[in-house]
Regions:
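Short, small-residue-enriched loops and turns at beta-alpha junctions
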Residues: 155-156, 195-200
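Conserved small/polar residues in nucleotide/adenosyl-binding loops
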Residues: 211-220
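Non-catalytic, usually N-terminal nucleic-acid engagement modules in DNA/RNA processing proteins
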Residues: 2-183
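Short glycine-rich loop/turn motifs
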Residues: 20-22, 188, 206
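Short beta-strand/loop segments at the ligand-binding rim of alpha/beta enzyme cores
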Residues: 184-191
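Distinct, well-ordered alpha-helical segments
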Residues: 199-208
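Conserved hydrophobic/aromatic pocket- or pore-lining residues that grip, position, or stack substrates
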Residues: 139, 191, 209
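Hydrophobic alpha-helical segments, chiefly the membrane-spanning helices
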Residues: 210, 223-228
């Protein structure tokens, strides 16, 4: 399939019962029926499984990790090899996280500023700088079907003031991630709602990301566990 033949990226609600719903994501590399479980291929490989074995489980999308692929083998090399999907032999859609969760989990090895995050590689201690723009660029180089906005993964527990400051930083980073994103037919970018366990902060976050509240019923939602 050439890029001119790819269907546009989109989402439709197929059925709804109260707050529960069943939907379908359409991408240039296949559909994903939601709710969906994403096998994790951290470093462009789902451990102990070949791509056809992953597909045989019914999985329609794989998640790969920007942080780990940035460190090894590096986004430039992955791009030269045709992207993560080609590298691992996976024909379906691919979602990459922004690298934010892993960077935030480094604790004393990282330093957060308005610009982004500076951190030491857990492999050899080399210094790296990850910004919303760089995270978005790397995910483009990895050829992610779904790119995630760069965010600060708020620690738990957090006070209200800590959660608000973290959420507001993530929303500023989200705007920069959006500006850096290169739109392509069949690809999409997701924002990430922050605000910890505080409902009003989460609604503020939604407003920042979508300019409407609550989340529209015809938009996809991705949930990942909070850091502890």
């Amino acid at each position: 399939m050439t890029k001119n033949d790819r269907p546009p990226f989109g989402f439709e609600v197929l059925q709804q019962d109260g707050a529960a719903r069943r939907g379908r994501v359409t991408s240039g590399f296949g559909v994903v029926d939601t709710p969906a479980f994403m096998p994790v291929g951290t470093a462009a490989s789902v451990k102990a499984m070949m791509p056809e074995q992953v597909a045989s489980t019914g999985a329609q999308i794989i998640l790969s990790n920007t942080y780990h692929l940035m460190l090894r083998p590096g986004p430039e090399r992955v791009e030269r090899l045709g992207g993560v999907r080609k590298l691992m032999g996976w024909d379906g859609p691919l979602l990459t996280d922004s690298g934010g969760f892993q960077v935030m989990s480094l604790g004393p090895l990282r330093n957060i500023s308005e610009q982004g995050v500076s951190f030491k590689s857990h492999l050899d201690g080399s210094i790296f700088h990850l910004t919303p723009e760089r995270s978005t660029q790397i995910q483009h180089m990895l050829d992610a079907t779904i790119t995630m906005a760069f965010d600060e993964c708020t620690p738990f527990p957090a006070t209200y003031d800590e959660a608000r400051a973290s959420m507001e930083l993530s929303m500023r980073w989200a705007a920069r991630s959006r500006s850096a994103y290169v739109a392509r037919t069949g690809y999409g970018q997701f924002g990430i709602v922050q605000g910890s366990v505080f409902e009003d902060l989460r609604h503020l976050s939604i407003n920042c990301l979508l300019y409407t509240s609550p989340s529209p019923r015809d938009r996809t939602r991705s949930r990942m566990p909070s850091s502890a």
